[in-house]
């Protein structure tokens, strides 16, 4: 799981770096100051917000696994679970200037989905989401309304596609300012032709086989990236 840095750290445009409380005790050692020091050498960090003390209360918020962030519109989407505490979610939103849109999501066997980034992805002009996982109609409609109001085209995925990590994608930007959508080959292969064509209207798709990681670690492409939005140092 140490190849999933997005669960313990996130970087923000205003210079904030957040450190997060982790559910699994063996993963708490991943929060390394050496990583933060490397980032500080290359980027401007104004403040470090350390939420990890919440582990003493046995409450958790596992970074951008727990929260899918619409950074442009400052919205934090989160499915509440033992790894995603609503109080900590609201604390994050108050500090970072986000609005929380929270809900409960379950898989097809009615088991809680503990990481939001498994069932949805928010990009610049679209969102990939498994709406079937949200049982409560009010919560589902609130999510749909929020996405539509922020100008996102909703691309719906099924439970079967969710199981193949089709929700675990991340839109990134190259040094040439080209937008790309990154996912695993398993996720890509699960998409139907219409879904692929719709996504490719917005950006190219990049995929790579991650089967061993997906099988052993339970995460996929998005989990392996902790995107840096900090301003680069000029010196």
Predicted regions and their residues:
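The feature marks the mature, well-folded catalytic cores of soluble enzymes
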Residues: 1-235
């Amino acid at each position: 799981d140490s190849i999933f840095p997005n669960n313990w750290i996130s970087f923000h445009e205003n210079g904030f770096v957040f450190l997060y409380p982790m559910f699994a005790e063996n993963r708490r050692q991943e929060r390394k100051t050496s990583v933060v020091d490397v980032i500080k050498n290359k980027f401007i960090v104004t403040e470090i917000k350390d939420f990890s003390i919440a582990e003493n209360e046995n409450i958790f918020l596992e970074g951008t696994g727990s929260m899918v962030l619409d950074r442009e519109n400052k919205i934090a989407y989160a499915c509440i679970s033992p790894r995603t505490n609503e109080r900590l979610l609201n604390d994050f939103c108050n500090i970072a200037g986000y609005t929380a849109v929270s809900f409960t999501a379950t898989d097809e066997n009615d088991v809680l989905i503990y990481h939001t980034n498994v069932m949805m992805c928010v990009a610049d002009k679209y969102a990939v989401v498994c709406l079937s996982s949200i049982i409560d109609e009010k919560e589902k409609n609130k999510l749909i309304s929020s996405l539509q109001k922020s100008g996102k085209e909703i691309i719906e995925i099924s439970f079967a596609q969710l199981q193949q990590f089709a929700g675990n994608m991340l839109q990134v930007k190259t040094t040439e300012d080209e937008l790309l959508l990154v996912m695993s080959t398993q996720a890509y292969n699960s998409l139907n032709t219409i879904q692929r064509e719709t996504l490719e209207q917005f950006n190219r798709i990049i995929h790579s086989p991650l089967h061993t990681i997906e099988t052993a670690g339970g995460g996929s492409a998005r989990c392996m990236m902790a995107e840096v939005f900090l301003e680069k140092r000029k010196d």
